[in-house]
């Protein structure tokens, strides 16, 4: 577990005894499980609406840090550090989102003598701003999309750069992510209003109105490379992830490896990714994102200085546990393998299961989960933060779980994932499960013909013949029957007595009904 150079006993001696997880949902559960596998005690933090959340139930200790708004709870680094000090936590794992890429919080952890499981504040600050990152990468000779390496100072400057690189161009928030502060501009007469709009949205979303401009690559693929770097100067790449299936610039389905990346291209992308990380003196887990044009040229986009939502597809195709490795790196251990030891085996595809209503433009769908049937079986992994009876709050990102299918090749991964999606059933709230069933049936997806516009095009196509769709009514009927039997108000009571029978119904045996109920539990 701890590598050839360090025995398991020695490794556990130098490891942390207690880690605080500064996050919620499925990623908090994921990190808690990794800690427990090492015998490390865990501390959860939660907002008032998350008191009954799964991560709170799984942790060894849990502490409230404030009201529902993230600005009063999960973004309050001072409260989180106070809990860490009070509980004796030696390290903090930030997960993704919230404070995971906040250099000030990472510095506050260092000042408090608590290890931040991630990069140094200096590396995070360098790569956290897209304009700063582009400036440093330009000096390091890293290829990036033509445009500005610094924020725009005026509309006139934007017009000058746009004329030089050629329309269409993309405006992007320097501190951005998730599609916020981004505008596609096709002509000069659109530029002024688009710039004002992008700057305004960037200020609202990130507290920073800085925007830069770059040439828009038409129909690009979004492909990223996972890296790991220890604190002894060793950096390796772990293969790419195809992240082109997006909605509103946010990923919804990812896979590894990419259908278009051959071994030579993978090696070149990996070497550039390592060069990026080394230029930033980067340590721990990180991801370098690239745009890839139709000629398979790739350009540096940005670096995510944290664990990614989609890390499971890399874990399945490399056989490595990235959270284990994050903890080991943070505890001072060298990487237990070299680049030559890394191999890509099989294929993995991840679906992000959201509490969203596909019939209402994917609007968030909070509420109580009345029935939950989750899939399993060969080649299926679930990273979940939900359970039956839990109420999904409206205050956070609606990600409920991640469903990952793994196979010896892409075709088998798709087959397994389709079967698992057909088994998945959630009642009480809306989810986007039906969207993934549709994606996996799409002929372009099956052929690997992907780019960032794939999903928009697919959603304009007519739905498949209902006869070829999965038997959702049958699944719903089974789930409803289970719910009816398990609900004491509808069926057998706890003392074994059946509810009153209608005159037209034959009397049911209390023992039989009790047995059926127990069999379904």
Give the ranges of each region predicted by the language model:
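Serine residues within intrinsically disordered or low-complexity segments
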Residues: 5-7
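N-terminal beta-alpha lobe that positions the nucleotide/phosphoryl donor
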Residues: 12-288, 292-308
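Catalytic cores of soluble metabolic enzymes centered on carboxylation/carboxyl-transfer
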Residues: 273, 312-314, 318-521
């Amino acid at each position: 577990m701890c590598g050839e150079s360090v025995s398991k006993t020695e490794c556990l001696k130098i490891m942390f005894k207690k880690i605080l997880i500064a996050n919620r949902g499925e990623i908090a559960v994921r990190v808690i499980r990794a800690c427990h596998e090492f015998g490390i005690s865990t501390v959860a933090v939660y907002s008032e609406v998350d008191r009954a959340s799964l991560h709170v139930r799984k942790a060894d200790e849990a502490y409230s840090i404030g009201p529902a708004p993230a600005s009063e709870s999960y973004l309050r680094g001072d409260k989180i550090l106070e809990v860490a000090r009070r509980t004796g936590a030696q390290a903090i794992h930030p997960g993704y989102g919230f404070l995971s890429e906040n250099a000030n919080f990472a510095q506050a952890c260092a000042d408090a003598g608590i290890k931040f499981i991630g990069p140094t504040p200096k590396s995070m600050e360098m790569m956290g701003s897209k304009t700063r990152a582009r400036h440093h990468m330009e000096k390091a000779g890293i290829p990036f999309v033509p445009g500005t390496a610094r924020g725009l100072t005026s509309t006139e400057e934007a017009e000058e750069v746009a004329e030089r690189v050629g329309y269409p161009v993309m405006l992007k928030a320097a501190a951005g992510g998730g599609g916020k502060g981004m505008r596609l501009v096709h002509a000069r007469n659109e530029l002024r209003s688009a710039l004002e709009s992008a700057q305004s949205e960037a200020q609202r979303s990130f507290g920073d109105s800085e925007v830069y401009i770059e040439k828009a690559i038409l129909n690009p693929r979004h492909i990223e490379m996972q890296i790991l770097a220890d604190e002894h100067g060793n950096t390796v790449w772990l293969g790419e992830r195809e992240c082109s299936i997006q909605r509103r610039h946010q990923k919804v389905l990812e896979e590894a490896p990419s259908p278009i990346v051959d071994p030579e291209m993978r090696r070149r992308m990996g070497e550039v990714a390592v060069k990026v990380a080394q230029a930033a003196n980067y340590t721990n887990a990180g991801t370098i994102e690239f745009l890839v044009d139709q000629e398979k040229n790739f350009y540096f986009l940005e670096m995510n200085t944290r664990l990614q939502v989609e890390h499971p597809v890399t874990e399945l195709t490399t056989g490595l546990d990235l959270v284990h490795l994050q903890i080991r790196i943070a505890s001072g251990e060298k990487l237990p393998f070299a680049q030559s030891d890394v191999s890509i085996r099989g294929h993995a595809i991840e679906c992000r299961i959201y509490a969203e209503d596909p019939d209402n433009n994917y609007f968030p769908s909070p509420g109580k989960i009345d029935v939950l049937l989750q899939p399993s079986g060969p080649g299926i992994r679930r990273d979940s933060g939900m359970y039956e009876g839990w109420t999904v709050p409206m205050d956070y990102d609606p990600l409920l779980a991640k469903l990952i299918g793994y196979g010896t090749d892409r075709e088998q991964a798709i087959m397994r994932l389709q079967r698992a999606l057909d088994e998945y059933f959630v009642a009480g709230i809306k989810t986007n499960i039906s969207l993934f069933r549709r994606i996996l049936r799409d002929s372009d997806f099956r052929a690997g013909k992907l780019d960032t516009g794939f999903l928009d095009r697919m959603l304009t196509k007519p739905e498949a013949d209902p006869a070829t769709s999965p038997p959702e009514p049958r699944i719903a009927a089974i789930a409803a029957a289970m719910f009816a039997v398990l609900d004491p108000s509808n069926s057998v009571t706890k003392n074994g007595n059946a509810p009153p029978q209608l005159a037209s119904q034959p009397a049911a045996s209390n023992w039989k009904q009790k047995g059926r109920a127990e069999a379904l539990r």
